[in-house]
Amino acid sequence: MKCGVFMEVYTQELPLRTSRRVELIDITSMVSGVLESSGIRNGILNVFSRHSTSAIFINENESRLLSDIESMLEGTVPVDASYGHNAIDNNADSHLRAVLLGGSQTVPVINGSMDLGTWQSIFFAELDGPRNRRIRVSVAGKP
């Protein structure tokens, strides 16, 4: 697809309240709502977590898989290990888990829809909750 020089950019912040220390929340419909509001039909969409103890990832929304992801995080970065950062704040595991998952995801926008695969959903990973969080969604492209 050919894109001209001039693009529109639309951005919106989404508030989110989490309820558990580790929580994986499907935000696909929230993000889709921002895309619809943007009026952009072709381009890219970025979802960014504005926090260093949370993450954004794309995967299948299946309850056993989500449980496996939580187990993988605990096995890879145990909450009770000895971390230097815990001398300041007792949440080093949350920061390290966020590094592994990443703080943003970018999705192509084609004909007004996110070009996600059949089983793909966008997730917000709370890694140090419960908290009030903010997610930034930016869409760039042509209407």
UniProtKB/Swiss-Prot annotation:
InterPro entries: UPF0047_YjbQ-like, YjbQ-like_sf. It holds the Pfam family UPF0047. Belongs to the UPF0047 family. This is UPF0047 protein MTH_771. It comes from Methanothermobacter thermautotrophicus (strain ATCC 29096 / DSM 1053 / JCM 10044 / NBRC 100330 / Delta H). The lineage of its organism: Archaea, Methanobacteriati, Methanobacteriota, Methanomada group, Methanobacteria.
